[in-house]
């Protein structure tokens, strides 16, 4: 299908896509474990797809804690190549839209390549739209994670961190943000302008490194965050950190950060990070609910809070240019 810049969105099939993955970086061999697609035509949901996928590798403990998807759940499920024909029925002839879609595309490009397919040819150079880019132009950088952006727009998110649920929430967020233009009558050219310009299925920079959104923003802005982390003692802890930069070490991504709990620089394995929340937002929630989060004082985390499990820790190594996602630690 060919796409025209003057076509209104109502005349373009839109495929809202979300992936859940074994870890934070496709460049380090992490794989898709769940794919969700919601296809809209004429502004209406016409088809949806959701499938657990056997990644043929271990799922990180942080991902299991965040998504609830375990190694046992994906063992014996279809592989990505098994499910690609079914997924293509919803992707073909559609613009591709996602929340921080660059992250999802980094995984999908490699999965397509494993199937001996070029994603650009397979998807006919589909237009790409990113609700994160639109939100940043509308609200500024920071605080644009899907589960925080949706309520800001009056949308109640469905189950978080599952592929189809997040794809549907992204669709409703996109629809709401397009209201400031002409809704579904917004032409493709104007939709591009809403996000600051066109995007493609390939990265603008071939050496682009992608990280989870919350970490990316924390590294860019040098702002403190509250991190939930699975530590070396197999406890789930919560602490305030100042992210500094990312290391590559023995095939893993490591976050270097100042830990307020230890008042020292520490390293955290990316695969053990469950989630990150901006410190200001966490403080506002605490003030509103009058409840403490994991023994934290208004200034800093005062002690660790045990919750659940994690694999063993790693030592530290060489610095790589700052990248953009969440990460992990050495306690």
Across the structure, where does each feature detected by a protein language model lie?
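Acidic two-metal-ion nuclease catalytic site recognized across multiple nuclease folds
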Residues: 1-6, 173-226
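Conserved non-catalytic scaffold segment of RNase H-like nuclease domains
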Residues: 1-113, 117-123, 140-143, 149-161
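Residues immediately flanking
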Residues: 19, 99, 131, 243, ...
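Short, glycine/acidic-enriched loop or turn micro-motifs at the edges of active sites
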Residues: 21-23, 133, 169
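Short alpha-helix plus adjacent loop in nuclease-associated cores
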Residues: 126-142
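Acidic, divalent-metal-coordinating active-site segment for phosphoryl/phosphodiester hydrolysis
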Residues: 162-175
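Core beta-strand-centered patch of the WYL/Sm-like small regulatory domain
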Residues: 206-331
């Amino acid at each position: 299908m060919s796409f025209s810049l003057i076509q209104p969105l109502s005349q373009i099939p839109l495929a809202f896509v979300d992936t859940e993955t074994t870890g934070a970086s496709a460049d380090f061999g992490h794989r898709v474990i769940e794919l969700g697609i919601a296809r809209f035509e004429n502004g209406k949901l016409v088809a949806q797809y959701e499938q657990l996928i056997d990644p043929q590798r271990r799922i990180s403990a942080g991902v299991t804690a965040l998504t609830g998807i375990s190694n046992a759940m994906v063992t014996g499920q279809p592989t990505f190549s098994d499910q690609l024909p079914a997924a293509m029925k919803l992707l073909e002839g559609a613009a591709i839209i996602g929340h921080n879609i660059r992250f999802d595309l980094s995984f999908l490009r490699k999965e397509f390549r494993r199937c001996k397919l070029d994603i650009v040819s397979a998807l006919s150079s589909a237009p790409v739209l990113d609700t994160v880019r639109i939100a940043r132009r509308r609200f500024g950088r920071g605080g644009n994670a899907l589960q925080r952006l949706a309520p800001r727009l009056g949308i109640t998110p469905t189950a978080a961190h599952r592929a189809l649920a997040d794809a549907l929430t992204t669709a409703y967020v996109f629809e709401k943000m397009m209201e400031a233009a002409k809704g579904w009558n917004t032409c493709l050219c104007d939709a591009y302008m809403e996000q600051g310009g066109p995007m493609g299925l390939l990265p603008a920079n071939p050496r682009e490194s992608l990280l989870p959104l919350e970490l990316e923003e924390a590294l860019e802005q040098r702002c403190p965050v509250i991190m939930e982390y699975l530590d070396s003692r197999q406890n789930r802890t919560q602490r305030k950190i100042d992210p500094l930069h990312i290391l590559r070490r023995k095939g893993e991504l490591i976050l270097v950060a100042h830990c307020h709990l230890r008042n020292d620089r520490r390293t955290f394995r990316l695969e053990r990070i469950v989630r990150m929340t901006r410190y200001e937002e966490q403080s506002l929630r605490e003030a509103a609910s009058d409840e403490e989060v994991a023994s934290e004082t208004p200034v800093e985390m005062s002690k660790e809070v045990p919750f659940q499990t994690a694999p063993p820790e790693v030592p530290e190594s060489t610095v790589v240019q700052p990248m953009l996602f969440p990460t992990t630690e050495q306690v």
